[in-house]
Amino acid sequence: MMINETRILNEFIELVSVPCPRKDEKAKADLLVQKLQAMGLEVKVDDAGRKIGGTTGNVWAFLPGNVGGAAGLFFEAHMDSVPPTTGTKVVRRDGVLYSDGTTTLGGDDKVGIAAGSSAGSAGAEYPAWRYPAVFYDCRRDRLFGSGQS
């Protein structure tokens, strides 16, 4: 099985278009929930955001495998990014993605989210995989969100 490079690049570009400063990751969480549920993953959002004064909790996703003893994969990423990320425009030069210079790219950690989400999509296509994932809120702020689950 191969990860679809076009899919993961498009996923990343879509993710960087959604601003997600620390403690205000609701738009990103809502997008993730929608995408993961559309792939057939079981999804829940916990109440970690309430505990830290944020707008969302951690997003948990799980895709049960259908083959006993099959290996599983676990993905973890955080949803917040170093500002400024509002209005990010992605530029591709020589096969490398950059911001246009007016904002940060937000690769930390939208790369992790894109990888996890794309693997979830691939896992839905190959159901022998077991796929647990968690996307933390407010990771940049002393791991607040990840410590509240």
Locate predicted features.
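Alpha-helical scaffold elements within enzyme catalytic domains, especially in hydrolases
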Residues: E14, Q34-K35, A122
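A non-catalytic alpha/beta surface segment that caps or lines the substrate-entry region
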Residues: P21-G69
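N-terminal capping segment at the start of a domain
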Residues: M2-K23
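Glycine-rich phosphate- or other oxyanion-binding loops that anchor nucleotides, phosphorylated ligands
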Residues: F144
